[in-house]
């Protein structure tokens, strides 16, 4: 949700811009978002909007109208770029000039809307409705028309135990955040991949939480390296790709000797509500899916069962689904890998004695009833490389565990989609495309207006 501020004695817009953005020149952005005609005059108690923004460098051929059309879908919003950037004549920009592109959504009024209700929804305070009226040139805040398009400023802010310590929202689709959180002893990163039309559509979207696998080369950037932008082009869904540790196993571990590594808390109790408070997503069962590769595929199945009301679809791409088979091979691997890579000798499930209740709570084959009324999608390889012990052991175990899981689902009368395909322990883009189509079909479709239950 966008940040707001109430002016106190002695404050100026320049001083506030320096405090909030680290740049006093951004006072114009605050003025534009808050409907202030004279930036030199603010009053004690006056409420201000502190929106997010993107810096843009003008290239040959650019005009403010063309940039407004590209960023916002409406050329006539060039005046907002001009106001935020301190440009007196919107028809004149120079190559190399740095522009401030305010971050806002275009909201289409539906029956029953009021400015005070929209202020409560977007700004967290119904009394801020005059700011929406001022920016949109509405003389009578008590009168708005169905179909009227409003400019409403947005932004990402701290909350739910997360403090933003780094961010980059300059890419048209892929936005990056890094958080400080007491759940993790270091600052985990998250990539959020937006639909092509997120900036301009005003729609609310379903969301997919996509989890990476284990290993020292795996983190929140993994799927970007694997081509996730192309794989999701044109799809009306938000993709959230968080850090999960090199061997975090999407769990709060039994023990850690390097500080907190509570990935389950970070993902479920902190990141999920933060996403829903800061992006236009559906905060409901039918608005969320979870998927992952390898360790992340296990995490997807685990979260879908353990947090039954959170996710309507769960997908495991070469992820283990049975923890206890073959004398608990997956549990032993989770304990060993987490001890070496993440926990300084601590373990996810306990060693030498396991926390048996925790294993059962996390074990997909022991949680079969928790997959009812969900879309389940499974992928496993049938021909791992025999010369590569890691590939062979991994995918052989994955295949056997998924077969056990599928049999139990079938015996319980729970529908599921499964694919056994040639190859070993690798991410398969063609299977992800197929999966994504099914996810989009299962979840609540993107929509505008009253259907949007949560927004920026």
Swiss-Prot record:
PROSITE patterns on file: LYSM
pH note: Optimum pH is 9.0.
GO biological process entries: lipid metabolic process
Pfam families for this protein: Esterase (PF00756), LysM (PF01476)
Assigned EC number: 3.1.1.-
Catalytic activity: a fatty acid ester + H2O = an aliphatic alcohol + a fatty acid + H(+); an octanoate ester + H2O = an aliphatic alcohol + octanoate + H(+); decanoate ester + H2O = decanoate + an aliphatic alcohol + H(+); a dodecanoate ester + H2O = an aliphatic alcohol + dodecanoate + H(+)
SUPFAM superfamilies noted in UniProt: alpha/beta-Hydrolases (SSF53474), LysM domain (SSF54106)
Catalytic residues, chain numbering: 294, 391, 425
Effect of residue 294 to A: Complete loss of activity
SMART domains: LysM (SM00257)
Function noted in UniProt: Exhibits lipolytic activity with medium chain length esters as optimum substrates. In vitro, pNP-caprylate (C8) is the optimum substrate followed by pNP-capricate (C10). May modulate the cell wall lipids to favor the survival of bacteria under stress conditions.
Name of the featured protein: Esterase Rv1288
Lineage of source species: Bacteria, Bacillati, Actinomycetota, Actinomycetes, Mycobacteriales
């Amino acid at each position: 949700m966008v940040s707001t501020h109430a002016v106190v004695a002695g404050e100026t817009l320049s001083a506030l811009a320096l405090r909030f953005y680290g740049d006093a020149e951004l006072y114009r952005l605050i003025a534009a978002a808050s409907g202030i005609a004279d930036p030199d005059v603010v009053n004690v108690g006056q409420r201000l909007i502190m929106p997010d923004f993107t810096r843009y460098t003008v290239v040959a051929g650019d005009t403010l109208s063309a940039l407004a059309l590209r960023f916002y879908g409406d050329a006539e919003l060039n005046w907002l770029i001009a106001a935020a950037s301190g440009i007196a004549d919107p028809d004149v920009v120079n190559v190399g000039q740095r522009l401030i592109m305010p971050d806002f959504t275009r909201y289409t009024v539906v029956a029953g809307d009021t400015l005070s209700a929209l202020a409560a929804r977007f700004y967290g305070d119904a009394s801020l409705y005059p700011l929406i009226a001022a920016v949109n040139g509405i003389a009578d805040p008590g009168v708005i028309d169905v179909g009227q398009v409003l400019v409403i400023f947005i932004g990402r802010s701290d909350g739910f135990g997360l403090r933003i310590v780094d961010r980059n929202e300059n890419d048209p689709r892929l936005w990056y955040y890094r958080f400080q959180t007491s759940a993790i002893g270091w600052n985990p990163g998250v990539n959020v991949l937006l639909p092509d039309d997120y900036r301009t559509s005003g729609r609310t979207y379903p969301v997919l939480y996509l989890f990476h696998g284990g290993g020292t080369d795996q983190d929140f950037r993994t799927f970007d390296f694997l081509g996730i932008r192309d794989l999701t082009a044109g799809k009306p869904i938000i993709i959230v790709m968080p850090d999960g540790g090199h061997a975090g196993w999407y769990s709060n571990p039994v023990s850690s000797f390097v500080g907190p590594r509570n990935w389950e808390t970070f993902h479920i109790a902190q990141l999920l509500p933060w996403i829903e408070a800061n992006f236009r997503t559906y905060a409901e069962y039918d608005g969320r899916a979870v998927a992952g590769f390898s360790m992340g595929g296990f995490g997807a199945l685990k979260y879908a069962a353990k947090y039954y009301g959170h996710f309507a679809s769960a997908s495991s791409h070469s992820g283990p689904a049975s923890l206890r088979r073959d004398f608990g091979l997956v549990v032993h691997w989770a304990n060993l890998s987490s001890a070496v890579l993440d926990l300084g000798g601590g373990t996810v499930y306990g060693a030498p004695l396991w926390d048996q209740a925790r294993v059962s709570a996390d074990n997909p084959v022991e949680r079969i009833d928790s997959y009812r009324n969900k879309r389940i999608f499974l992928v496993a390889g049938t021909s791992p490389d025999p010369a590569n012990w890691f590939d062979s052991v991994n995918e052989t175990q994955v295949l056997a565990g998924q077969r056990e899981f599928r049999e139990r689902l079938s015996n319980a009368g729970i529908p599921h989609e499964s694919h056994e395909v040639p190859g070993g322990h690798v991410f398969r883009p063609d299977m992800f495309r197929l999966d994504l189509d099914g996810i989009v079909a299962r979840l609540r479709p993107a929509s505008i207006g009253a259907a949007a239950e949560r927004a920026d």
